[in-house]
Amino acid sequence: MFVSRLAASGLLLLALLAVSLDGKPVQQWSQNWPGPKVPPLVVQQWSQNWPHPQIPPLVVQNWKSPTQLQPRESPAGGTTALREELSLGPDAALDTPPAGPDVGPRGSKAAAAPQRLSKSKGASATSTASRPMRDLRTDGKQARQNWGRMLNPDHHSAPGGGGGGGGGGARRLKGLAKKRAGSGCFGLKLDRIGSMSGLGC
């Protein structure tokens, strides 16, 4: 009895789906549905021939090639005077006139004077430029001496050592230190590593 009720309700649903709200079948209702209005063929052709902006053919178009551009119209932008200076070489950047035949009575010396002047200017410029770097270096002679004193305090404390006078005790200690450093750990000879290098022997 329950199954028959289920079957009856299913059939009723199918019948309701087949009939539309007006009471007409679904196929007839879909045929009468107003679709999008398609304009006639004459109107379509007229819309395709709508006046567009006239584009001249490629032969008529007169574009400037990159070689025809003036120096001030460079496509990359920026200053072209700098590029011209760089292309001419370092002599153009220094603004020194080239030595010609009308130099004067002492042609060779007068021509060499500006070059010598520019070289001295360049040398002083490089020395002033490298001075801060020289000051920042930590491996100077004095720094190395300080490190040597810190690592080998007994080496520099000998009396009478030094350059020309005295008994040369520092040299003796230097030789002993070399021998002491030469006798290595575990029977191996150490070449440049000192006894205070932290090998633990």
Curated annotation (Swiss-Prot):
Low complexity bias locations: 120-130
Propeptide: 24-47, 58-60, 67-95, 107-179
Domain of life: Eukaryota
Compartments where located: Secreted
Pfam families: ANP (PF00212)
Region feature Disordered, mapped onto this chain: 90-172
PROSITE patterns assigned to the protein according to its UniProt record, in alphabetical order: NATRIURETIC_PEPTIDE
One BP term from GO: regulation of blood pressure
Keyword Disulfide bond annotated: yes
PANTHER family associated with the record: C-TYPE NATRIURETIC PEPTIDE (PTHR12167:SF2)
Name of the protein: Bradykinin potentiating and C-type natriuretic peptides
Lineage: Eukaryota, Metazoa, Chordata, Craniata, Vertebrata
